[in-house]
């Protein structure tokens, strides 16, 4: 038997976009992480997380537009490479309610990124092989980061993605080193 309910009676999940932002610094792959804020009702206070946030239905025409906005907010640049990674959702991923996130990954040359001064304490680059000590990444971000790493490593074998991590112009030896 099918229920016929008005759409206004259906609870809606929290909808977010998270962006895994990669760069290369000091000959190693790094990921940008943000520290979760403290305050009443904030989940995972003080834990590290991927940059992201809620979809703004007034500002964002699409999920990709939201991802581009979040990327620009945290890095001050628009990525020449932004790829949708996948979607994660469950009742358990956010203590505030049923939540779905749509994850993207971006590749940026380190020199192009200008972290905003007010984000200096809360947004930091971390080597992907040595994430910060303390509690695990907030929400299901460790799983999302792992998926992004696997996708990037796979695509390096048959695409020119590493070129997006280099400042322009770059030399052939720089590109070869990136691989």
What are the residue ranges of the model-derived segments?
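Short Pro/Gly-enriched beta-strand edge/turn motifs at strand-loop
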Residues: 1-4
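The catalytic Nudix box helix
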Residues: 52-84, 104, 175
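Short connector loops at helix/strand junctions that flank enzyme active sites
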Residues: 14, 77-79, 97-101, 118-120
């Amino acid at each position: 038997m099918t229920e016929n309910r008005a759409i206004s009676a259906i609870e809606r999940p929290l909808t977010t976009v998270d962006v895994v932002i990669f760069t290369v610094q000091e000959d190693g792959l790094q990921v940008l992480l943000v520290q979760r804020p403290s305050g009443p009702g904030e989940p995972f206070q003080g834990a590290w997380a991927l940059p992201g946030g809620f979809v703004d239905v007034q500002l964002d025409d699409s999920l990709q537009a939201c991802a581009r906005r979040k990327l620009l907010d945290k890095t001050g640049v628009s990525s020449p490479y932004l790829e949708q990674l996948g979607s994660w959702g469950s009742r358990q991923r956010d203590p505030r309610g049923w939540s779905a996130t749509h994850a993207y990954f971006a590749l940026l040359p380190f020199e192009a990124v200008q972290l905003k001064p007010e984000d200096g304490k809360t947004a930091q680059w971390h080597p992907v092989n040595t994430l910060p000590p303390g509690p695990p990444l907030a929400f299901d971000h460790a799983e999302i980061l792992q998926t992004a790493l696997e996708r990037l490593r796979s695509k390096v074998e048959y695409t020119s993605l590493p070129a997006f991590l280099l400042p322009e112009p770059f030399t052939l030896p720089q590109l070869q080193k990136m691989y």
